[in-house]
């Protein structure tokens, strides 16, 4: 009985986290696992830390909705990546392929289809991203996080499973988080996350308010690669990280409130941990608008406050943080009533049912 699976997904941490949640569970069930990603994406760094999962890099190009000279050469990179993925899948002979999206996943899903191997795509956002839109016709099943997404998917392919949250996030230890950051017990903690690539506007507005905010909060700031500010390195009550992985559960456990972008994976993790959140979604100028839809959905459900990037100023950020903290108990009560089912188990069952025997 062939129980081999190839995972794919990359470009941002959000396109890898579901795979990281799946891997330990798949191992428990006796699956042989491999990963196809890009040569230099964040997925390579994250998966390289996972024991027993060989990584196969392929060529990939970004598919854009706007004019860029790279639009003329990137399709050839995608074509090259498709041939590479086809050969890898032909050699590895998986019984199923699972994709979390991102541009590297398009060649892999097409490569699986060319080999007659079933594939499953997981779409986190309310509206499918461009990569998943291209890959969907070649996939066997498409899992969605938001029920609203089903209207964008063929009825016979779409399955609503909810959000997949990593089990280790639920095992965070607040005391370990405080030790890591040299924070004291009793003073509220604000966790700031600008996404795996960081956010200059959020970083700048936060640091402009640090002197005031540190009177009332301890702040752990995940600011993105190359964005640590040496001016604040030794400031008491303020801890900066470029990026965190193993430490994240402990940092989340000690946080009282969260300031974040509105990527679907992250906000559902905050929901699972009952962390009141202030969301600053990427603007439509900088994205396709998916984070705005995610944020508005959470705002409507009473899980989050939303500050649009075009309204982001030093003053508006400071006021929103204090307002969130003052109303944190109401947000937690709303989260307690949320319907957060076991999406991970649903996904594992679907993988087992869809695989090629």
Swiss-Prot record:
The family database entries (InterPro entries) matched by this protein are listed as: GlcNAc_MurG (IPR006009), Glyco_trans_28_C (IPR007235), GlycoTrans_28_N (IPR004276)
Lipid bilayer topology = Peripheral membrane protein
Annotated residues that bind UDP-N-acetyl-alpha-D-glucosamine are located at: 12-14, 166, 196, 291
- What is the annotated localization of this protein? Cell membrane
Cite the CDD domains for this sequence.
GT28_MurG
A Pfam family (short name) is Glyco_transf_28
Q: Which UniProt keywords apply?
A: Cell cycle, Cell division, Cell membrane, Cell shape, Cell wall biogenesis/degradation, Glycosyltransferase, Membrane, Peptidoglycan synthesis, Transferase
The entry sums up its family as follows: Belongs to the glycosyltransferase 28 family. MurG subfamily.
General function of this protein: Cell wall formation. Catalyzes the transfer of a GlcNAc subunit on undecaprenyl-pyrophosphoryl-MurNAc-pentapeptide (lipid intermediate I) to form undecaprenyl-pyrophosphoryl-MurNAc-(pentapeptide)GlcNAc (lipid intermediate II).
Protein name, entry field = UDP-N-acetylglucosamine--N-acetylmuramyl-(pentapeptide) pyrophosphoryl-undecaprenol N-acetylglucosamine transferase
Species per Swiss-Prot/TrEMBL record: Geobacillus sp. (strain WCH70)
Q: What is the lineage of its organism?
A: Bacteria, Bacillati, Bacillota, Bacilli, Bacillales
What is this protein's gene name?
murG
